[in-house]
């Protein structure tokens, strides 16, 4: 029987400006506090999920002076009892208040600089937050498993069926936005279903499935960005390098772009925790040490070598890097 991972963390709680309480864990370095990594979990998850990854990241980051913070967001679990909450009834735009409160908590703990790391739907949220607020305390973004919910659902049920379901959800939402869609589709309110699966919604920040999409959120970000995906992510509808290439081409204002594929890892990075920990530590170390500059490198499969970097707008004319799979 596998022993549960022992994680040296403190249990904490914060309150958002609109009165929502969020539980979480933090693991802090003993000495100098260089920056904080705030991990934003995915759809319906909780702060305590993925304990092997919490242990891997905290034990790697803390000796480097990086604090590790992971909180529930108001979309944790499936549904709450006192009022309509949880993933089924979450409003994506309210994630801004959650992340703002998380950053404020880290600042009160003595961290003046923050890297936001979002996994799955958490990646949508941190990108949306950074593009909308341009919070100067945020010095970098890590997008982990940044898969479009729309692309993933089209892969699962087909584009025609998804369009039919969206049309029905629109009819339900006109009567009552909080009414549930058919149970076979999952446990969602009509409003939440449309937020997840209707193209052009605020949550649709990874529109690689749509030719000529604007990518407004990613193109509005100016801090260093890393996109990390598992080579066996079950929600991918294309090769991992193609996905990374789409992000690279649209991170037009980011100071730098790093794309990494973790070999053998699935969407939750199970079994790839060590490689992911190495990759994240390397990216965060560069960002913290140099502020916004990242050394040139190449796309890697795994976290032990130098990450692939595309320079920001200020230096792109002098040097560009392209993976062999990226179209010219």
Label each region the model flagged:
Residues 1-31:
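N-terminal cap/lid segment of alpha/beta-hydrolase-fold proteins
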Residues 31-73:
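Short, surface-exposed "cap/lid" segments of acyl-processing enzymes
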Residues 74-90:
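Cap/lid segment of the alpha/beta-hydrolase catalytic domain
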Residues 86-108:
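Alpha/beta-hydrolase active-site loop
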Residues 105-168, 200:
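Primarily recognizes the serine-hydrolase "nucleophile elbow" in alpha/beta-hydrolase
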Residues 221, 227-229:
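Short beta-strand/loop motif that positions the catalytic acidic residue
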Residues 234-243:
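Conserved alpha/beta-hydrolase "acid-adjacent" motif
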Residues 265-274:
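Catalytic histidine-centered segment of alpha/beta-hydrolase-like enzymes
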